[in-house]
């Protein structure tokens, strides 16, 4: 593998992906995802936007102290205060990057920035020079680049390269471009930019027209050697380019691209499942690579062909992307040390002995209900337990559901708020409705339910049900998750989890005037 054919994978799940409505993660959840991304083999982890809030700064800083192989990056606007906060946040990382940006399209410069092109260039150059005080690895992005004038882009990119930028990122911020135009744009821009051959060119594509992956691949054909993407394509609006699709497209169609990545493809599905569990965003069954149906064959002709020779209808194996990782993990006789070791193997570290003891107690309860415990069960269990460890949270204690044909279901539920036990009862059009009404009779949150979903963690009737609840109130949108072999218990846990984030979680407003690439 040479530098010319090596593609750098820049994962922004923890920054751009987290901007999906309700996908905000706690610091501990971000660290879990970062560890899995490092295991996946991504080159750059964009850990967040350090200047956006104190919580963001803490999360970026914690990831910088945790990750040793991947480069840890923070986004920042082309503003000195932002850049210095980013530099301080990533300082502990063995390998660190600052990613600074400013808008370059005529519409953004005129209406958002209210700056002249010359002023934008001056701000960009100053930003890169400040970033170089903290690290030699500086990325510069031209927000809304694909709607910018190419001659102006060449001028500003040449200026920031001279100032010390080592990576130039060209985002399709609003998902406007189409593949052949993207390839042409990159080819022309790289040639026109002074010293354009001395830096790594990067693509960051949004999926508003469903073309994020196609545009990213086209950018590679046009000379880019870094792709910015997210697990499961998570991101604002219609999302970002998905890391799994880009990586497997390059691997399966190596004959066309001749490009390599450093990704361990067997970690793709585990990464997808972890991000889905933590964010509460389920993966659609027909999603390429990581969807539950990605390797299913219903047609008799297809089934016959696959049985005779797999490659008749499969261009890659399920095992190559990690579907074989649905392994039996532990059983009811497994001890605490075996449990702790298994969590470490899965990249899960709990912050205290108290947290480990609580998770182990939950594991033993689960093992009594479910004969076979799989890796996915442990991920769901730990996510559920970590969500209830906060002392200032809503915590599930117990519930009784009464249903009879022709009668309204009734829910009697016991839970606590800040350690104070509460009891509530309600009837509803169904058991789920009754549970939500019972909780709300005490919580009085005033939140609107946006999404309620249930997914089986593993196969079989003994599987844990993993539920997601999305609540909205004002400009706050939160996701809550719950897991249990009883889906109605999981439902109550998910609703209480969402309420905990809504009432006690720190709000995370964007920094004033911030944009997104």
From Swiss-Prot:
- Which chemical reaction does it catalyze? 3-methyl-2-oxobutanoate + acetyl-CoA + H2O = (2S)-2-isopropylmalate + CoA + H(+)
Pfam families in the record: HCS_D2, HMGL-like, LeuA_dimer
Q: Which UniProt keywords apply?
A: Amino-acid biosynthesis, Branched-chain amino acid biosynthesis, Cytoplasm, Leucine biosynthesis, Manganese, Metal-binding, Transferase
- The top EC class, named as a word, is transferase
Using the record's annotation, list all stretches that form the Pyruvate carboxyltransferase domain.
Answer: 7-269
* InterPro entries named among the record's database cross-references: 2-IPM_HCS-like, 2-isopropylmalate_synth_dimer, AIPM/Hcit_synth_CS, Aldolase_TIM, LeuA/HCS_post-cat, LeuA_allosteric_dom_sf, LeuA_bact_synth, PYR_CT
Q: Does the keyword Zinc-finger apply?
A: no
Annotated pathway, please?
Amino-acid biosynthesis; L-leucine biosynthesis; L-leucine from 3-methyl-2-oxobutanoate: step 1/4
GO biological process terms on file:
L-leucine biosynthetic process
Superkingdom is Bacteria
* Gene3D superfamilies with a match to the protein in the record: 1.10.238.260, 3.30.160.270, Aldolase class I
Binding locations of Mn(2+): 16, 204, 206, 240
The UniProt annotation puts the region (Regulatory domain) at: 395-517
Q: Name one GO cellular component term.
A: cytosol
* UniProt cofactor(s): Mn(2+)
Query: What's its EC?
Result: 2.3.3.13
List GO molecular-function terms, semicolon-separated. Answer: 2-isopropylmalate synthase activity; acetyl-CoA C-acetyltransferase activity; manganese ion binding
The record's subcellular locations are: Cytoplasm
The function of this protein is:
Catalyzes the condensation of the acetyl group of acetyl-CoA with 3-methyl-2-oxobutanoate (2-ketoisovalerate) to form 3-carboxy-3-hydroxy-4-methylpentanoate (2-isopropylmalate).
Listed under subunit, the entry gives:
Homodimer.
Instruction: Report the HAMAP family cross-referenced here.
Output: LeuA_type1
Which family does the record claim for this protein? Belongs to the alpha-IPM synthase/homocitrate synthase family. LeuA type 1 subfamily.
Name the record gives this protein: 2-isopropylmalate synthase
- Species annotation: Neisseria meningitidis serogroup A / serotype 4A (strain DSM 15465 / Z2491)
């Amino acid at each position: 593998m040479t530098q010319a054919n090596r593609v750098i994978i820049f994962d922004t799940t923890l920054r751009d992906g987290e901007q999906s409505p309700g996908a905000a993660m706690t610091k501990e959840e971000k660290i879990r995802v970062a560890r899995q991304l490092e295991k996946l083999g991504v080159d750059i982890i964009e850990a967040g936007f350090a200047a956006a809030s104190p919580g963001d700064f803490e999360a970026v800083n914690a990831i910088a102290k945790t990750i040793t192989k991947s480069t840890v990056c923070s986004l920042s606007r082309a503003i000195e205060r932002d850049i210095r906060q980013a530099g301080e946040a990533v300082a502990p990382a063995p390998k660190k990057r600052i990613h600074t940006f400013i808008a370059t399209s005529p519409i953004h410069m005129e209406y958002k920035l209210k700056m002249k092109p010359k002023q934008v260039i001056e701000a960009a150059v100053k930003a890169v020079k400040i970033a170089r005080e903290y690290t030699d690895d500086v990325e510069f992005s031209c927000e809304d680049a694909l709607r910018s004038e190419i001659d102006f882009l060449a001028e500003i990119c040449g200026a920031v390269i001279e100032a010390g930028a080592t990576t130039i990122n060209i985002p399709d911020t609003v998902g406007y471009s189409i593949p052949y135009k993207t390839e042409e744009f990159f080819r022309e821009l790289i040639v026109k930019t002074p010293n354009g051959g001395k830096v790594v060119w990067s693509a960051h594509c949004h999926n508003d027209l469903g073309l994020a992956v196609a545009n990213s691949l086209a950018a590679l054909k046009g000379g880019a050697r870094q792709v910015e993407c997210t697990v499961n394509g998570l991101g604002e609006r219609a999302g970002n380019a998905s890391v799994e699709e880009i990586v497997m497209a390059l691997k399966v169609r190596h004959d066309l691209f001749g490009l390599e990545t450093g990704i361990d493809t067997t970690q793709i599905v585990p990464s997808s499942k972890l991000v889905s569990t933590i964010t509460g965003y389920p993966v659609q069954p027909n999603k390429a690579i990581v969807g539950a149906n990605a390797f299913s064959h219903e047609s008799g002709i297809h089934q016959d062909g696959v049985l005779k020779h797999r490659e008749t209808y499969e261009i890659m194996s399920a095992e190559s992307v990690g579907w074989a990782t649905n392994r039996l993990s532990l059983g009811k006789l497994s001890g605490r040390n075996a449990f702790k070791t298994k969590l470490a193997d899965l990249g899960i570290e709990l912050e205290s002995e108290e947290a480990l003891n609580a998770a182990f107690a939950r594991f033993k309860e689960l093992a009594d209900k479910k004969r076979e415990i799989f890796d996915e069960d442990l991920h769901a269990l730990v996510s559920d337990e970590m969500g209830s460890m906060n002392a200032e949270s809503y915590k599930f204690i117990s519930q009784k559901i009464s249903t009879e044909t022709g009668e309204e279901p009734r829910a009697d539920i016991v839970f606590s708020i800040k350690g104070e036990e509460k009891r509530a009862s309600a009837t509803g059009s169904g058991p789920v409705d009754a549970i939500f009404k019972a909780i709300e009779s005490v919580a009085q949150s005033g939140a609107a339910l946006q999404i309620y979903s249930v997914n089986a963690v593993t196969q079989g009737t003994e599987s844990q049900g993993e539920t997601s609840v999305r609540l909205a109130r004002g400009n706050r949108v939160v996701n809550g998750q719950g897991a249990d072999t009883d889906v109605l218990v999981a439902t109550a846990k998910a609703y209480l989890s969402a309420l905990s984030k809504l009432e006690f979680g720190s709000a995370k407003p964007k920094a004033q005037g911030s944009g997104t690439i």
